[in-house]
Amino acid sequence: LVVRVLLYFYIITNHMKKLLFISAIVFLSCAFTQQKKTKVIFFGDSITELGVKRDRYVGYILKMDSMLKVQKKDDQYELHGTGISGNKVYDLYLRVEDDVLTKNPDVVVVYVGVNDVWHKTLRGTGTDADKFEKFYLAILKKLKDRNINAILCTPAVVGEKTDYSNPLDGDLNLYSNIIRDIAKKNSLPLIDLRKKYHDYLDKNNPDNKDRGILTYDGVHMNDAGNQFLADAMWKTIKEIK
């Protein structure tokens, strides 16, 4: 009888060990196969700085976060904003190492150009077109050297009039064309905000107002503008593999 009991105990113990071993293998397998989140950094000026705030309006990056939760994709993406008010392209170049590369992102959305144009008349400290292109390309080289996916954005608006009577429309178009050419020559995804905003305003600004449709001051986004920006950016970001 004692032998039978011991044999039974041995069989049960062995069976339990096997079950525990199998459970451990399954657990570790799930842990290691868990999908790594795609880290996205939005790199830009005050529009991006406001993108992570809830001050006057909910910023576009926060809106995108909410969109991801609704779509049940928040376990797939990690969004970060590194925007500084007043920044131009050379400011981004000077801080790309500390604010972007050290964070090891998978995707960087480069959204700059408004201040390079706007500050020429506002403060006399804009960026000449040739220098803008050189600094922009230098930023992209740093990203490419680290195998980071770059998404380019054209500057949207400085004034919302649709008849091209905003004082800086000409320069904005010029700098947007520079970014378009860079994207085309380097086979990089482009979010053409300049075109998207103009197309939207053309249909939704019948009184030709200089602000109040997508921006509260002609430059910075109101609630509708932040949502428009979030939708436009997400459409491209989700295609990056």
Question: How would you label these PLM feature ranges?
Answer:
Residues 2-5:
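Acidic, Ala/Val/Gly-enriched low-complexity intrinsically disordered segments
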Residues 35, 67-75, 91-241:
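Alpha-helical cap/lid subdomain in secreted, periplasmic
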Residues 13-19:
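Positively charged n-region of N-terminal signal peptides that target proteins for export
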Residues 27-28, 55, 202, 232:
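Alpha-helical transmembrane segments and their juxtamembrane interfaces
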Residues 19-28:
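Sec-dependent N-terminal signal peptides
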